[in-house]
């Protein structure tokens, strides 16, 4: 599945990604992406969010998705998609990217191909560099 080095594992890490990151939504998921390399300005604690070992993922699957069986199945499918993105598409994310994927109510019934398409769309949209004109 998803190795420990690719997981967000504290509420502070989730909070940082959700508050400081960019987000893109679709019918089934909302993708929050935060690049720790461009956001660290010296005012934060160094240990707040680890930025080594590759991109890190966190999942939020609420009761809106369905009962416990549906939520756990959805979580397993999302973890598998994240692992395949890390393995097969390393150009999509840098090692300093931290991603939180929030499953919406439609994610429980959506096919895996649709979930993967929506996650890739969200990652592509949030990882684009913004330019000020």
Swiss-Prot record:
GO terms for cellular component: ribonuclease P complex. This is Ribonuclease P protein component. The lineage of its organism: Bacteria, Bacillati, Actinomycetota, Actinomycetes, Mycobacteriales. GO terms for biological process: tRNA 5'-leader removal. InterPro entries: Ribosomal_Su5_D2-typ_SF, Ribsml_uS5_D2-typ_fold_subgr, RNase_P. RNaseP catalyzes the removal of the 5'-leader sequence from pre-tRNA to produce the mature 5'-terminus. It can also cleave other RNA substrates such as 4.5S RNA. The protein component plays an auxiliary but essential role in vivo by binding to the 5'-leader sequence and broadening the substrate specificity of the ribozyme. NCBIfam families: rnpA. Pfam families: Ribonuclease_P. It catalyses: Endonucleolytic cleavage of RNA, removing 5'-extranucleotides from tRNA precursor. Consists of a catalytic RNA component (M1 or rnpB) and a protein subunit. Its EC number is 3.1.26.5. Keywords: Endonuclease, Hydrolase, Nuclease, RNA-binding, tRNA processing. One of its GO terms (molecular function) is ribonuclease P activity. Belongs to the RnpA family.
């Amino acid at each position: 599945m998803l190795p420990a080095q690719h997981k967000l594992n504290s509420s502070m890490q989730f909070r940082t990604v959700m508050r400081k990151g960019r987000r893109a939504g679709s019918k089934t998921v909302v993708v929050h992406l935060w690049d720790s390399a461009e956001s660290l300005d010296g005012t934060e604690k160094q240990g707040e969010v680890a930025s080594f070992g590759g991109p890190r993922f966190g999942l939020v699957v609420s009761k809106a998705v369905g009962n416990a069986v549906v939520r756990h199945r959805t979580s397993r499918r999302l973890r598998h998609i994240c692992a395949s993105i890390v393995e097969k598409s390393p150009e999509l994310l840098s090692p300093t990217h931290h991603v939180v994927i929030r499953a919406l109510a439609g994610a429980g019934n959506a096919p895996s191909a649709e979930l993967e398409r929506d996650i890739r769309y969200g990652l592509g949209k949030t990882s684009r560099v913004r330019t000020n004109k």
